[in-house]
Amino acid sequence: MAQNDSQEFAELWEKNLIIQPPGGGSCWDIINDEEYLPGSFDPNFFENVLEEQPQPSTLPPTSTVPETSDYPGDHGFRLRFPQSGTAKSVTCTYSPDLNKLFCQLAKTCPVQMVVDVAPPQGSVVRATAIYKKSEHVAEVVRRCPHHERTPDGDNLAPAGHLIRVEGNQRANYREDNITLRHSVFVPYEAPQLGAEWTTVLLNYMCNSSCMGGMNRRPILTIITLETQEGQLLGRRSFEVRVCACPGRDRKTEESNFKKDQETKTMAKTTTGTKRSLVKESSSATLRPEGSKKAKGSSSDEEIFTLQVRGRERYEILKKLNDSLELSDVVPASDAEKYRQKFMTKNKKENRESSEPKQGKKLMVKDEGRSDSD
């Protein structure tokens, strides 16, 4: 049987199934011969392929350290949070003073997105978590090993991702090929009729105090509005703390924040007062002696008003002011004569008051002692 097969193969080989071109040319000549090509074949097909140059990627380069500053962009992108108090029963609350979100593990956190101008069709909203402090910002924020092994039920998101999107089946979870950072994005949806914002529900799947995870290191959540190709249209960020009692922690941190602000304000006021006093003392020290005004004279014509509490003080200050006004009017020579006359009159009155009346002799202490002796 095998021998018959080999004979048939040899006969086929001898017949040479490859079509030989007329004239004994090469088989490649058939390709160049238009007789053997279909009528729809484009002879410039390969030239067009070679002339096409590779186009650069429209995706922006990935940054090792993501930017956290607010960027509303041309569309006026910004965030809002529902108002909530500091009661112990709240599961999610936002502090405008701190720009910080306090929430419980795996609880719903509504984030409202507002734009002034609608973004292009197909735009997406992305949420990324990074560490706030510079010494930790290069590390990837991920769940602790304990919560990572805990089944979540839906299995839609990778186990290591901290941020989840609730109630949206179109959420896409990504891990960057270069930085390995985790992010989740959803298609941007225009606000519903009568509403000004679009709401996205976020879940944080690990506590801030978990060992092996965030380990009490503060984190930021960056919300970006991007085109379908990854071009940035807007960016906002806020701090997040995942804890057991969000209301209590918010109240405590806001109280500490206000105390720090008051301390800084008092320190600035004290520093400014000290600087002004030092400046005045230095200017007084550097002032030449010749610039000092002579006592008893005043060439300043500016008038001031002084408010005094109490009639007695007013009379004293009035007499003092009248004396100063009189000294400015009376010449110095006449003032000296009046002063001498006043002193002489006072001495005479003192001498008369010291003499005893009705001829009685004033007993001196030493004289009385000598008589007794």
UniProtKB/Swiss-Prot annotation:
- What SUPFAM superfamilies does its record include? p53 tetramerization domain, p53-like transcription factors
Q: Where is the composition biased (Basic and acidic residues)?
A: 250-265, 346-373
Recorded hits in Pfam families, A to Z, give: P53, P53_tetramer
Query: Where is region (Transcription activation (acidic)) located?
Result: 1-31
Q: Where is this motif: Bipartite nuclear localization signal?
A: 274-296
Entry cofactor note text?
Binds 1 zinc ion per subunit.
Region annotation Oligomerization: residue ranges?
A: 301-332
Q: Which residue positions does the secretion signal occupy?
A: none
Entry similarity comment: Belongs to the p53 family.
Q: What is this protein called?
A: Cellular tumor antigen p53
Which species does the entry assign this protein to? Danio rerio (Zebrafish)
Q: Which gene encodes it?
A: tp53
